[in-house]
């Protein structure tokens, strides 16, 4: 994976002439998890260098797919993905490779609280994985979602040349409106990832580990009763690593590039 290049003109054309003419249900057709995105079937995901992309830079965008947040994946595919990518590329990120994930609630017995795409460089393949996300639309009344599943997968099931060759951390962004699940139960990791661990994993400890190779951020939809959730996120991640977005997500096209560009280190031969 990771071949091809991103064409913002072609992507923008598809957004306006294809995706914007469709309903959310027509774009996101999945009625269950796509087998290619099922973490139980995935041993490892890789972001690798190639002759075409010698300085790969991994970016994970993990989207809350529960009932209150389905408008954000829709917004990204219909409106803002070309703007996000164009901003990143124009700012000098040479070889961005983007993975989309879907995040739900593993405490509410969702079918697919974690869905994992591939790292891609081309517009068509990024769109392929984004539209494969199953918008399960559930989530419970427990006031949190299982965002740490994205951290766990990145920490245990992703390898990148950016880190192994250049000690360049990737960027991992979760987007949602709930608080963060405090503990991943070992039974949940077994059920949804086929990973057998000896004990439950405290999310704050997991965060310490994943931060060794990833710059971790959260973009928070901060409307109404969800304002308290942002405070919880700030206590966990730290000030400046949690960014509030408009309820309609209209400013996400500016927020995501800003976070990414703040972490990117240009190759030495480009400086």
Name each region found by the language model.
Residues 52-116, 121-169:
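Von Willebrand factor
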Residues 111, 159-162, 181, 185:
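Extended, composition-driven regions rather than compact fold-specific motifs
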Residues 48-53, 89-92, 156-167:
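Surface-exposed acidic, glycine-flexible loop patches that form ligand/cofactor-binding
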Residues 222, 236-271:
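C-terminal helix of von Willebrand factor
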Residues 63-65, 151, 169-181, 185-188:
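DG-centered beta-turn motif at the end of beta-strands
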Residues 178-231:
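VWA/integrin I-like adhesion module and closely mimicked acidic/polar interface patches used
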Residues 6-60, 67-74, 78, 86:
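Acidic, polar low-complexity linker/tail segments
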